[in-house]
Design a protein with these regions (language model features):
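Hydrophobic h-region of N-terminal signal peptides that target proteins for export
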Residues: 28-36
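Bacterial N-terminal signal peptides that target proteins for export
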Residues: 8-25
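A short, amphipathic edge element
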Residues: 42, 71-73, 145-157, 212-215
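Surface-exposed, polar helix/loop patches in the mature regions of secreted/periplasmic/lumenal proteins
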Residues: 102-152
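Short, conserved active-site entrance elements at the starts or edges of catalytic domains
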Residues: 137-175
Length: 269
């Protein structure tokens, strides 16, 4: 009996040792696989792009512009977008002096039309106008209607992970592609790990990648239709010391929007 017991414990000891070795090897394999699946800069930016560019969206928002002198101007507008932001229609509803004014952006803001209710005329802007300020804000037309720009116009490189306002973030550098006409030489983006919301984006000068020209902040993140949505978006100019804040009043995703809305005729409605 004693010999059998000793043999049993010896066998058990060997099996226990083997079990430990197997567990250790499994853990090593898991770590290796995890490292092999580490997200690249392109992976992160694709997730960001998929998050912010839904198929269709409606928004009502208030835009407050603070000029260099500290003066403030406020507009309220509605916007409709389709095809992942490639088509965007914006219509101002307040104050009275701009009520009815509308902006149509197609082909990722490469084609822009504006409607002025006082004259009843529709005017097509020159192609380079997409780089200009929209309604004298700190947002350009291409900022507001450029769809898949993070993927189409930039290459991505993952930098060292960082924190922003206590949140763990991926940090990614986006560098302008040689054939792109986007207004920025590069972007630095802080992306929350938990939901891939880009909470901070730095924009650098088109001709000098060392000159920071403005920063975008996304705050008050709420879940709407399963999508993390920033209800407060702030663009601050580092050159002019001005800022523009967009506060969402209402937002709806994946709604039915007719293609007829994105036509010159619809601007006058």
């Amino acid at each position: 009996m004693r010999e059998n017991a000793k043999s049993f414990y010896k066998i058990l000891s060997k099996e226990a040792k083997m079990s430990c070795v197997k567990v250790f090897l499994t853990m090593c394999l898991f770590v290796a696989v995890a490292l092999g699946q580490e997200l690249t800069g392109d992976d992160i930016v694709k997730k960001v792009n998929d998050l912010i560019n839904v198929e269709t969206a409606y928004m009502k928002a208030k835009m407050t512009i603070t000029t260099t002198s500290g003066a403030k101007r406020t507009f309220t507008y509605e916007s409709w977008s389709k095809d992942r932001g490639a088509k965007t229609l914006m219509r101002y509803i307040a104050p009275p002096r701009v009520k009815g004014q509308a902006i149509l952006m197609l082909n990722n803001a490469n084609d822009i039309w504006m409607y002025f209710p006082r004259t009843g005329r529709v005017r097509k802007l020159a192609t380079h106008a997409k780089k200009q300020k929209m309604m004298d804000s700190d947002f350009s037309y291409e900022d507001m209607g450029s769809g898949d720009t993070f993927i189409d116009d930039f290459t991505a490189k993952r930098l060292k992970d960082d924190k922003y306002e206590g949140e763990k973030c991926y940090k990614v550098e986006l560098t302008k592609k040689p054939d792109s006409d986007i207004s920025y030489s590069r972007l630095i983006m802080w992306v929350r790990k938990k939901d891939f919301v880009p909470v901070l984006i730095e924009y650098y000068d088109e001709n000098n990648p060392e000159i920071l020209i403005k920063r975008l902040y996304q705050k008050d993140i709420r879940i709407i239709d399963g999508i993390p949505t920033a209800f407060k978006i702030i663009m601050k100019s580092e050159i002019e010391n001005s800022s523009t804040e967009i506060e969402l009043i209402d937002v709806k995703y994946d709604i039915q929007i007719s293609d007829d809305m994105f036509t010159e005729r619809s601007l006058k409605k």
